[in-house]
Regions:
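A short, flexible beta-alpha/helix-coil linker loop
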Residues: 101-104, 161, 306-310
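Short, charged/polar, Gly/Pro-enriched secondary-structure boundary elements
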Residues: 45-52, 160-163, 377
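Non-catalytic nucleic-acid substrate-recognition regions in nucleic-acid-modifying enzymes
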Residues: 2-138
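Residue-level signal for inorganic ion chemistry
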Residues: 23, 96, 144, 304, ...
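C-terminal catalytic and target-recognition region of SAM-dependent MTase-like enzymes
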Residues: 287-404
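Class I S-adenosyl-L-methionine
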Residues: 99, 124, 145-187
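Conserved S-adenosyl-L-methionine
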Residues: 176-294, 309, 317
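Basic Arg/Gly/Lys-rich low-complexity intrinsically disordered segments
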Residues: 2, 370-480
């Protein structure tokens, strides 16, 4: 039996339950929900699958040591006691991310320096040589988390944040994070059973993530690589098997519609959709929401309208008034989900939300609200809807956000919220300098064929071909 070990999947606040459900479906064990994280146990294959398949995880950490420390010297001694040759070659590079919630350790950079010193001194004493530190694209990325005096040192198996799927070619200003977009879609219970509409789709993040969910395409298939591919115990054959397994992918018989009134956004969305290989599933149209008409088929709206950071208040309130008007007159019999962080914007919609889910979009504390659009009174609408479902004899219904399985809470003392006035470390994905994706040019790294549609049709009967270094995932633009 393969060795089982603990792992931690980091995510955004508000997506923890969705992530736990994903891990359950993946076959993970001992799932416990914490704040912006979910812990679980599994083997090496599970770690590879978690990185490759999870839509709402930012990164997957593998803890290698838990200890308590009251000062920097204790941290140094505990780190130096680790047999580092099991995790790092002296000729390889490494980097350290520190996350600190502690009165004893107030500066995360100082903690990083102490960890670095302990590792360097370990190798210098053992071999007379030392590994080098490389901030961008290191061979091994370490994460140390300190909550008061409780310390956890982990290997970061992901490297570049998992929200960087690899299909995004360009972006509009302040694009929606891919992990958040996927989490929003999964919260609604939609899995491709009807058409999906984003009337303000920007660079196309929601439509692309929706297509990947509907077709059950793993989000990791577009990535250049993962940090674990540079580990000393990397099993290339095992990961190739996971990468090449498309047996869970499925057909999508409906359509996803993306609208926007910005020509540049429409152009960018077109490139991103093509890079993801889902152009056949998404219909893009340059159209303002004012011209939105009642869809012929049952549909769901999931959208992330502007919040007002770059729009005047009057224009913003007018926009949300228009959203409410279009929903009431051109989306009857369907449901719409809207993300925003301003209460006055929601007020302008003029509809009563049947569900409100708190979410964070970067530093903004938002709400994701569900609106059920109907004619007449709400009670009549619900009784008619329930009667139709009973008459049709439908079995399982799409899962509802409030009816999820309960998971064990994370043990106390870990990932505590900060006190008032206490400095807050950077959230995952927030204002973090981009760490370039793995270069993976070494001879022992086996690159895989990208799946973008511009690479031609794929033979589903056999594995993807390996063609050396991965090619760009979208053709270069022809010179005019």
């Amino acid at each position: 039996m393969s060795e089982q070990f603990e792992m931690i999947a980091k995510t955004f606040q508000g997506l923890e339950e969705i992530l736990a459900e994903e891990l359950t479906a993946l076959g993970a064990n001992d799932i416990q929900i914490g704040r912006r994280m979910v812990s679980f146990t599994g083997d090496k294959r599970m770690m590879y699958k978690a990185n490759f398949c999870l839509r709402t995880a930012i990164r997957i950490l593998k803890p290698i040591k838990n200890f308590t420390a009251k000062d920097a010297d204790e941290v140094y001694n505990q780190i130096q006691a680790i047999p580092w040759e099991e995790y790092l070659d002296v000729n390889k590079t490494f980097a350290i991310d520190a996350v600190v919630f502690s009165e004893e350790f107030r500066h995360s950079k100082f903690v990083s320096y102490k960890v670095k010193d302990a590792i360097v001194d370990y190798f210098r004493e053992k071999t007379g040589k030392r590994p080098s530190v490389r901030i961008n694209n290191p061979d091994v990325l370490l994460n140390i988390h300190i909550a008061q005096t409780t310390c956890t040192l982990s290997l970061d198996s992901s490297g570049e944040s998992l929200h960087r799927r690899g299909y995004r070619q360009e972006a509009v200003e302040a694009p929606l994070n891919e992990v958040l977009a996927a989490g929003m879609i999964l919260m609604t219970g939609w899995r491709g059973e009807c058409d999906l509409i984003d009337p303000m789709c920007g660079s196309g993040t929601i439509p692309v993530e929706a297509a990947l969910i509907a077709k059950n395409i793993a989000p990791g298939v577009f990535r250049k690589g993962f940090a674990f591919e540079k580990w000393v115990d990397f099993d290339a054959d095992m990961f190739d098997e996971i990468y090449n397994d498309d047996s869970q992918e499925r057909e999508f018989t409906h359509k996803i519609y993306g609208y926007d009134n910005n020509p540049k956004a429409n152009e960018i969305a077109t490139h991103n959709i093509k890079a993801a290989g889902v152009s056949k599933d998404i219909v893009l149209k340059l159209q303002p929401f004012q011209q939105f008409e009642q869809p012929k088929e049952k549909s769901i709206i999931i959208t992330n309208p502007p919040y007002g950071e770059r729009i005047s208040t009057n224009d913003l309130l007018g926009l949300y008034q228009m959203i409410g008007e279009r929903l009431k007159h051109a989306f009857v019999g369907n449901e719409a989900w809207v993300l925003s962080y301003r209460e006055e914007c929601f007020d302008q919609i003029g509809l009563k939300a049947s569900q409100k889910v708190p979410l964070f979009n970067g530093p903004l504390e938002c709400e994701f609200r569900k609106y059920e659009i109907f004619d007449g009174k709400y009670k009549e609408f619900k009784s008619q809807e329930e009667g139709e479902e009973k008459k049709e004899g439908e079995g399982e219904q799409a899962p509802r956000f409030r009816e999820r399985k309960e998971f064990k809470p994370r043990r106390e003392g870990e990932f505590k919220p900060r006190r008032d006035g206490e400095s807050r470390p950077r959230r995952e994905g927030e204002y973090k300098p981009r760490r370039e994706g793995g270069d993976f040019k070494g001879g022992d790294q086996r690159d895989r064929k990208p799946r973008g549609e511009f690479r031609g049709g794929r033979d589903s009967r056999g594995p993807r071909e390996f063609r050396g270094n991965r090619e760009p995932r979208i053709p270069k633009k022809e010179e005019e």
